C-alpha cells in the first residue's frame, strides 16, 4: 500500500514539474479559415462550393437509400 502511495505521489510530482507545452521548434505557419489555404487545400470559395455539393449529394443518397424515397420525390 505504501509503495502505491509513493508511486502516485511521484507521478504527481513528475507531471507537475514537466512542462508539456515545451516541444520542438515548429516552423509551421498558421493556415486555415482565417488565413491562406493550407497546402493541398483549395481556396475558400472553391472549398465551400465543393462541400455544399458533397452535402447535397449525401442528403439525396440518405433520402434514397436510407429513407426509401423514390427518385422522383428527391
Curated annotation (Swiss-Prot):
GO CC term, one of those recorded: extracellular region
Keywords: Signal
GO function terms (MF aspect): bioadhesive activity
GO biological process, one term: puparial adhesion
Signal peptide: 1-23
Protein's UniProt keywords contain Signal: yes
Superkingdom, natural source: Eukaryota
Name of the molecule in the record: Salivary glue protein Sgs-7
Organism: Drosophila melanogaster
Amino acid at each position: 500500500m505504501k509503495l502505491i502511495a509513493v508511486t502516485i505521489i511521484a507521478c504527481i510530482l513528475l507531471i507537475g514539474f514537466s512542462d508539456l507545452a515545451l516541444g520542438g521548434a515548429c516552423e509551421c505557419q498558421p493556415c486555415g479559415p482565417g488565413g491562406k489555404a493550407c497546402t493541398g487545400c483549395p481556396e475558400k470559395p472553391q472549398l465551400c462550393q465543393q462541400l455544399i455539393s458533397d452535402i447535397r449529394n449525401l442528403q439525396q443518397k440518405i433520402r434514397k437509400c436510407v429513407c426509401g424515397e423514390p427518385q422522383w420525390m428527391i
